[in-house]
Amino acid sequence: MMISCKKLFVFRQLPAVRRCLAAAAFSTPRATSYRILSSAGSGSTRADAPQVRRLHTTRDLLAKDYYATLGVAKNANGKDIKKAYYQLAKKYHPDTNKEDPDAGRKFQEVSEAYEVLSDEQKRREYDTYGQTAENIGRQGGGFPGGGAGGFGPEGFSQSWQFRSSIDPEELFRKIFGEGNFRTNSFDDFADSKFGFGQAQEMVMDLTFAQAARGVNKDVNVNVVDQCPKCAGTKCEPGTKPGRCQYCNGTGFETVSTGPFVMRSTCRYCQGTRQHIKYPCSECEGKGRTVQRRKVTVPVPAGIENGQTVRMQVGSKELFVTFRVERSDYFRREGADVHTDAAISLAQAVLGGTVRVQGVYEDQWINVEPGTSSHHKIMLRGKGLKRVNAHGHGDHYVHVKITVPSAKKLDKKRLALIEAYAELEEDTPGQIHGIANRKDGSKQATAGASEEPGAGAAAKASAAAAGSGASKPGPGAEESEGKDQWTDNKKTKAKEGGGSGSGQGDGGGGGFISKIKSMFN
């Protein structure tokens, strides 16, 4: 059956035939040979090898299922397609997924799928032929499977693939605005020997005193500032920028996407309306560079470990996190501080005053008579300054009684302690070196007199003899032994036998006088 070329061209325009040809073109990859015969008037074929052209068809377009790329159904409306694109674009955007090396490729595929499916005409052509008319024309004319439109004059193979006419980044900005994503954080300044960008956060070490009282500390940080060479003009010194020829100085360009016409920022001058013929070599025509600056960081009084403050550095913000060193003296609980104060045994019994170190100045505290160990004294308003509120915290002083060691006491003090131990009442348990007598009294077991009740007197007499002091006579000791002393709870008469009745009155009188005589 012979069909002329003109009739064949008309025959190919029928929709049913076009669909069949398109289906045949996207069938299993194959290599088809075409034998070019001699003209009808020659009557015979050439004797040499026949001319053969091979056309390779592939499944590239079938592999790129744009509906599957966006994860939508084939009957999805424009709203669902846009929603799916927005979610996938955020997921695979290079600025938000820097760890995935394939993020850029996936973002490109998502953008391609959205550009086709969001346009009604391109979507209709894609549903019919598997590609758009724009790409068909880019491949050499003709629809898929139609004549020699799929291969060149010299005989070659080619695959059909989508070629976007709009940059994916530009498409994203057009749809969702300029402020959602910053595609390149270094677009408006150039890097330098100091780094690739401005410092956004840093950690500062502080002592406890610096954190408590506040301080101004100088640190060196990277900042983005005006280029020192071109003074922000972006041009080499001695030159000036000219008007952008691509947007005619308007700063905007018109982009046609099928039936829609969109006006966007000029991609050549980035909306500046100017064209820089001789850009500055220092800042690469960007007007700003990364520079090292000394910045004073005001540390607020009462700052805590791990807290972060925000401060303005140039045109950007710097977040400073403080790392406060632990103090060996102060213990912090929010705005309150706790310290320990050591007092002597005599101060604990008789009372007194002691000087303690404060947060801002030293403080004198009063120790009441009979203060026990670990007693807590509060100094109201003497703590740390509150950072997020008015006023100061409190300073709590924990009292600790310093007990002298028996090995470090001299004979006088040891004798006094042992004498007090013999007179002490309501002792929980037993004291080493002090024996309890049957009548309830106590007696020193080491170096004590054989007579009952003479332990304290013997201790005192030995200490007095060692220091050269005079020793009271026996008569005075006997008269002192006959004295009586009164307790708050009970009154007990002490009777001594001979020179060994040296208990005496514990609150005053003979025994106290005898003890004092050791130091006269």
Curated annotation (Swiss-Prot):
Appears to produce proteins of differing size. Predicted to have a molecular mass of 56 kDa (TID56) however proteins of 50 kDa, 47 kDa and 40 kDa have been identified and named TID50, TID47 and TID40. TID50 and TID40 localize to the mitochondria while TID47 localizes to the cytoplasm. TID50 is probably TID56 that has undergone mitochondrial transit peptide processing. TID40 and TID47 may be alternately processed proteins or may be isoforms resulting from alternative splicing. CXXCXGXG motif repeats lie at residues 227-234, 244-251, 266-273, 280-287. It is found in: Cytoplasm, Cytosol; Mitochondrion; Mitochondrion outer membrane. GO terms for molecular function: ATP binding; heat shock protein binding; patched binding; unfolded protein binding; zinc ion binding. Residues 430-520 are annotated as: Disordered. Ubiquitously expressed throughout embryonic development. In larvae, expression is seen in sensory organs, gopplet cells, gonads, imaginal disks, proventriculus, fat body, hematopoietic organ, midgut, Malpighian tubules and ring gland. Residues 446-476 have a biased composition (Low complexity). The modification N6-acetyllysine is found at K106. Pfam families: DnaJ, DnaJ_C, DnaJ_CXXCXGXG. The modification Omega-N-methylarginine is found at R30. PROSITE patterns: DNAJ_1 (PS00636), DNAJ_2 (PS50076), ZF_CR (PS51188). A zinc finger (CR-type) spans 214-292. Residues 479-495 have a biased composition (Basic and acidic residues). Changing K286R: In strain: Oregon-2 and Oregon-R. Keywords: Acetylation, Chaperone, Cytoplasm, Developmental protein, Membrane, Metal-binding, Methylation, Mitochondrion, Mitochondrion outer membrane, Repeat, Transit peptide, Zinc, Zinc-finger. GO terms for biological process: mitochondrion organization; negative regulation of smoothened signaling pathway; protein folding; response to heat. It comes from the Eukaryota. Signal peptide: none annotated. Interacts with ptc (via C-terminal cytoplasmic region); the interaction is probably direct. Interacts with hh/hedgehog; the interaction is probably mediated by the hedgehog receptor ptc. In strains Harvich and Apxo, there are 2 identical genes which code for l(2)tid protein. Involved in hh/hedgehog signaling. May act as a tumor suppressor in larval imaginal disks. This is DnaJ homolog l(2)tid, mitochondrial. The gene is l(2)tid.
